């Protein structure tokens, strides 16, 4: 799964009538799939693309659960 597909899947999941926990679980599953599909032969550009998609997913999570989303974003080193 490339980052564009992941972002589209995340947007679709975000719009489904799921509980907050189910939505967050689905978004984190998409994020995990992206990282599972990377390896030592993944280029720097592809890795940066995956990181940007991850940040997008974490911002969606932040919209559902501020604290959880903020911790994920901080873990990526995107904020102080």
Task: Describe each PLM feature range.
Residues 1-80:
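Alpha-helical propensity feature that highlights long, continuous alpha-helices across diverse contexts
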